[in-house]
Amino acid sequence: MEVSENATTRGSLALVSIILPVHNAEQWLDECLMSVLQQDFEGAMELSVFNDASKDKSRAIIEKWKVKLEDSGISVVIGGHDSPSPRGVGYSKNQAVAQSTGSYLCFLDSDDVMMPQRVRMQYEAAGQHPTSIIGCQVRRDPPDSTERYTRWINHLTSDQLLTQVFTSHGPTVIMPTWFCSRAWFSHVGPFDEGGQGVPEDLLFFYEHLRKGGGVFRVDHSLLLYRYHLYAATHSVLEMTIWTHRVHFLEEQVLPHWKSFTIWNAGKQGRKLYRSLTAASRHKVVAFCDVDENKIRKGFYCYEDSQERPKPKVPILHFQAAQSPFVICVKLDLTGGEFEDNLKSLDLQEGRDFVHFS
């Protein structure tokens, strides 16, 4: 059964709708909803919750907070269903958006906590960047979980928000920090509703970029971003994400290059080479590396190829290789050694190389 209810009369539409999908979130909801109540934004605000077949006390907690929020002037729309199984994050977000009224959408996950300034600061930024997804910096809980990832999302430059969209880290501003206009969401969306195992945020982000959307980050830590084993992120298969990433690279970058070098003659570089279409593989002029053993080997032979003779790709020292590069070396892992090597070549990110690690 689908239900949607709103006790307040909708005489005036909200300026900002907070979009909150919920599935069995009882242990985090109080803190999450308290953070909605504590927003210092002075415009009309609405909370749109979609309860995706929760079997715990989530529904009762939402009902309790509905009263508190409406008493403080925040209207609340509750939708949901009580089918035996959940329909997934993409479906829930689409439903929460559809039942909401705000001109702007502020996405929130039920296990995260907003800082009081979040809606206000992102709303201001969205007014200046109407076709962008607005993100923000985050604080991780627990603090020592995913340190490299957290550093990456908090410190990308404004250019890198667009050039580093091919890495395994996914969207350069993370989904629970997204804020955008409803008009732009409708132009790009909706989210993929394939359910468990579908990286719906990544697919939406790619579609947003295809349509010429920008990416902007408010440089304040406006979200407490929780890491735990129940997170929906963990249900997405690495291979699924890999396939989408390779396809996006082949669509967005490789058509502009006549030839290129894959930086990393090891496992990741070879995996990328094998994952490319034949047309893209033919553009690979070399692998490059710093590992003397790999370089001494001289070449990589693609054994699984149907071609005769089988393709042999030279392996060079990075200083002897030709740009542009697709870089398959993980960032922030080699104590700065890789970053120094890359810097020594004086290349421009996005034009002379992209990161695909």
Swiss-Prot record:
What EC identifiers does the entry list?
2.4.1.-
Q: Which key words are in the record?
A: Cytoplasm, Glycosyltransferase, Transferase
A Gene Ontology BP annotation from the UniProt entry? regulation of translation
Q: Name one GO molecular function term.
A: tRNA-queuosine(34) galactosyltransferase activity
Which GO cellular component terms, listed alphabetically, does the Swiss-Prot or TrEMBL entry include?
Answer: cytoplasm
Q: Where in the cell is it found?
A: Cytoplasm
Chief location of this protein within or outside the cell: cytoplasm
Keyword DNA-binding part of the UniProt annotation: no
**CDD domains in the cross-refs:** beta3GnTL1_like (cd06913)
Q: Which reaction does it catalyse?
A: queuosine(34) in tRNA(Tyr) + UDP-alpha-D-galactose = O-5''-beta-D-galactosylqueuosine(34) in tRNA(Tyr) + UDP + H(+)
Query: What family is it from?
Result: Belongs to the glycosyltransferase 2 family.
Name the job this protein performs: Glycosyltransferase that specifically catalyzes galactosylation of cytoplasmic tRNA(Tyr) modified with queuosine at position 34 (queuosine(34)). Galactosylates the cyclopentene hydroxyl group of queuosine(34) in tRNA(Tyr) to form galactosyl-queuosine(34). Mannosylation of queuosine(34) in tRNA(Tyr) is required to slow-down elongation at cognate codons UAC and suppress stop codon readthrough, thereby regulating protein translation.
The name under which this protein is listed is Queuosine-tRNA galactosyltransferase
Protein species of origin: Mus musculus
| GN (gene name) | B3gntl1
